[in-house]
Amino acid sequence: MAAIGHVGVIGAGLAGLAAALAAASAGLRVDVFEAESAPWQPQAHIDVVPNLLRDLVRLGVGEACVRRGFPYRGLAVLDGDGRAQFEIPTPRLAGTQFPSSLGMVYGDLIDLLREAAMKHGARLHTGREVRDACESDNNSDAIVTTDGERHHVDLAVIASGARLPALAGQAARAMPLDILPQQWCHALLPRPVTLERATLVIGTGSIKAMVIPVDTRRAGIAVLQPVGAAATPAAMRATLSSQGRLLQSLGARWSDDTPAVVRPVRSGLLDGPWHAHGVLRIGHSAHELPPHFGQAAAQAIEDAVVLGTLLRTRPSRDDLLDAFMARRAERARQVHAVVTQAARWDLRPEAATDLPALAAQLAALVTEPA
């Protein structure tokens, strides 16, 4: 079987653009197919945790991310009035010239990855929904768009989240999902002058809020709510007004024109190989993690970095698929188990609930690159 020279990526989100950048940087021809005509620009933050920043550095966009974001060190855990409870360290994994972690606007990271991928020669086809991906007769793959065009590539990579194309004319294998009755409401607010690092605020009842500075003017906030709860600005102000002083002050910054992004809490991992009919699934098409410890994004980018590393060896498609699973499957399973436990403790705290111990368990898994 011939070496891979042309990669087709389905989806232009974090995983897809990172995969396109990784493959193009490895010297391969890359085409990206995105169903939407305009880039997704969510008004939300992304927590660039240590292992995520390390992989962004490996992709060549680390310096640009630091310039665009807000570096911080350590996650502070406070009560609703702002009193310190404990701290979770953020080790410096990206090298001494980089901070340990940083906050960014989600859309800014999307922009940086897209620009870098295109600079390295990747071609982006927007408004081109893919209806089918399959193995061709000549040991290559075919990507078929809804307009009927058939695009031949050596490797097709699905990175379109839950929006999966068919595989060889059949529905793609479903990923088992545990849907928790919770949601996170995200927004960008004016940054409190005293906010200089990621902060988890534990209020009364089930209310929690993650607050992360994204630049000198703004901070991202994510408020944990019961699923289906109202997420209008008025509803969020009312929710936070019943909490301690710190959460009250954040709620007061939530103006009527503040857009929000609501994300349900889901946990899933694709059973068995992440490939079928010669087509590879990565990112949220293969695993969906709760947002805890920043691993939902980190694991998606890690998929792309591993893919790029393997492509540099010019493997055949089948050899790459086997090597990719050997590098990613067990590691992703272990990380998925840790962050899912954190989400379940949010839902139903136990006597054994120990967030610092869980963070330490995660750190042991991701300290070394995949």
Protein language model features and the residues they cover:
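C-terminal auxiliary extensions adjacent to catalytic cores
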Residues: A360-A370
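Conserved hydrophobic helix-helix packing surfaces used for dimerization/oligomerization
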Residues: V7-V9, V30
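Conserved FAD/dinucleotide-binding core of flavoprotein oxidoreductases
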Residues: F86-T90, A94-S100, V105-D108, R114, ...
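Conserved mid-domain beta->alpha element of the FAD-binding
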Residues: V9-S25, A159, P259-Q341, W345
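Glycine-rich FAD pyrophosphate-binding loop
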Residues: A24-A44
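Conserved N-terminal helical subregion
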Residues: A2-V7, V49-Q170, D178-L188, V227-P233
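Conserved Rossmann-like nucleotide-cofactor binding loop
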Residues: A15, A38, R163
